[in-house]
Swiss-Prot record:
This is Transcription elongation factor GreA. Necessary for efficient RNA polymerase transcription elongation past template-encoded arresting sites. The arresting sites in DNA have the property of trapping a certain fraction of elongating RNA polymerases that pass through, resulting in locked ternary complexes. Cleavage of the nascent transcript by cleavage factors such as GreA or GreB allows the resumption of elongation from the new 3'terminus. GreA releases sequences of 2 to 3 nucleotides. It comes from Streptococcus thermophilus (strain ATCC BAA-491 / LMD-9). Belongs to the GreA/GreB family. PANTHER family: TRANSCRIPTION ELONGATION FACTOR GREA (PTHR30437:SF4). GO terms for biological process: DNA-templated transcription elongation; regulation of DNA-templated transcription elongation. The gene is greA. One of its GO terms (molecular function) is DNA binding. InterPro entries: GreA/GreB_C_sf (IPR036953), TF_GreA/GreB_CS (IPR018151), Tscrpt_elong_fac_GreA (IPR006359), Tscrpt_elong_fac_GreA/B (IPR028624), Tscrpt_elong_fac_GreA/B_C (IPR001437), Tscrpt_elong_fac_GreA/B_fam (IPR023459), Tscrpt_elong_fac_GreA/B_N (IPR022691), Tscrpt_elong_fac_GreA/B_N_sf (IPR036805). The keyword Transcription applies. The lineage of its organism: Bacteria, Bacillati, Bacillota, Bacilli, Lactobacillales.
Amino acid sequence: MAEKTYVMTLAEKKQLEAELEEYKLVRRPEVVERIKIARSYGDLSENSEYEAAKDEQAFVEGQIQILETKIRYAEIVDSDAVANDEVAIGKTVVVQEVGTSDKDTYHIVGAAGADIFSGKISNESPIAQALIGKKVGDKVAIESPAGSYSVEILSVEKTS
C-alpha cells in the first residue's frame, strides 16, 4: 500500500524538522527524567506522578512518530515554479467577496502547516481547492459548509 504524501513547502518541512528535534532532544529526555524521579517514590501501583509521566511519554513518542512520518513522506512544492500571479501552495492570496467590500487574506500551505488562527489554510481545504491554479482577476465560486459564495482574486504573492 502506498503511503500518503504530505504536500508542503521547504519552509514547512524545516519547521517540522525543528519540532522533531525539540521532541527528541528536549521533551523526550525531560519525560524520561520525570519517570525516573516518579519511580523513586516507591510503589508504582498507586503512583500518580509515574502514571502522568508515562502518559506524557506515550504522547511524546506518538508526536515523534507523526513528525517522522510527515517528514519522510514530504512532497516539497516549489512555489517559484508557478506563475507569479497564480495561486499555489506557498503563496498568499487576497480575495474580496463579490458584491461586498469584505476582503480576506489566506496563506496557502500544506496540511501539516495549516493554522486557521494565523490565516494559514491547508491546500486540502475547500477554499484553497477552489483558489489553487487561479490567477489575479479571476472570480471563483467557493463551496463551504456555510454555503456557496463568490470571490475575486485581488492579489497573489509568494509567502515569505
